[in-house]
Design a protein with these regions (language model features):
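Hydrophobic/small/kink-forming positions within alpha-helical transmembrane segments
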Residues: 10, 14, 18, 45, ...
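Alpha-helical transmembrane segments of compact multi-pass small-molecule transporters, enriched
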Residues: 38-43, 97-111, 187-192
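Membrane-helix interface residues
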Residues: 27, 89, 115-117, 176-177
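Hydrophobic/aromatic residues within transmembrane alpha-helices
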Residues: 23, 32, 85, 111-113, ...
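Hydrophobic alpha-helical transmembrane segments in multi-pass integral membrane proteins
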Residues: 44-55, 104-120, 160-174
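Hydrophobic core positions of alpha-helical segments in small-molecule transporters
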Residues: 8, 35-36, 70, 97-100, ...
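Membrane-interface interhelical linkers
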Residues: 1-11, 20-68, 73, 79-89, ...
Length: 217
């Protein structure tokens, strides 16, 4: 069953990248992140109530809350970096780097949780890293242009924070339903995203968002 959910996660992650690229066109990426997080928050809490696990929020330990908040903060940082990278870079280059967080997550899981990393896993990580590098290089060769590498920095930061999200969530989700944990983490992301929007003074641009942008977001 976990394999099915993993495949679905990959599918929706791919759709997210395409839809987000369309949605953030001609608008601030931080505002876009804040708006789409509202949708995610509503969806996640609807799922919590549908599953009937909302009462679990009253039984969370201090440790669980702490790691869920930290995981949410890492998620927020990852999303903000990721969508800014998408805005200024190509999807074909940003997405592979972002998804390379899997490699870092496997390494951190081995270091902190003692999870097994055998020869097959090591070979897989090497191949994933090589594939990511080749995809980036191929795209640069095809364009034949030298572009600013700002997108690369944000894409790398997105991958690092995404990896930290997985590790922190692993600890925070141990004593809580995954749907409830996701909803709590998303609430943290929402607060963080809007703080960034107001801190950068971009809230004034919300009124200029078109229907196309809003629909894709």
């Amino acid at each position: 069953m976990w394999l099915l959910f993993a495949f679905l996660s990959a599918l929706f992650a791919g759709l997210t990248a395409i839809l987000a690229k369309c949605g953030i066109e001609n608008m601030d990426s931080n505002v876009a992140t804040a708006i789409r997080t509202i949708v995610v928050l509503i969806f996640s809490w609807v799922l919590v109530f549908v599953m009937g696990v909302q009462n679990g929020i009253f039984h969370l330990s201090g440790k669980t809350i702490t790691f869920l908040v930290l995981s949410g903060a890492a998620t927020g940082a990852s999303w903000l970096c990721y969508f800014h990278a998408l805005q200024i870079g190509d999807v074909n280059r940003v997405t592979p780097i972002d998804k390379s967080s899997t490699i870092l997550t496997m390494i951190l899981a081995f270091l902190f949780f003692g999870e097994t990393v055998g020869a097959v896993q090591i070979c897989a990580m090497v191949l994933m890293g090589a594939g990511t590098y080749l995809m980036i290089q191929k795209k640069e060769t095809e364009t034949g242009k030298k572009t600013k590498k700002t997108w690369l920095l944000y894409a790398l930061l997105s991958a690092v924070f995404a990896s930290l999200t997985s590790i922190l969530a692993k600890v925070g989700m141990q004593d809580v339903d995954s749907n409830l944990g996701t909803a709590i983490r998303t609430a943290v992301v929402l607060v963080m995203a809007w703080v960034v929007v107001f801190a950068t003074g971009k809230q004034k641009t919300i009124h200029g968002i078109g229907r196309k942008n809003g629909g894709f977001l």
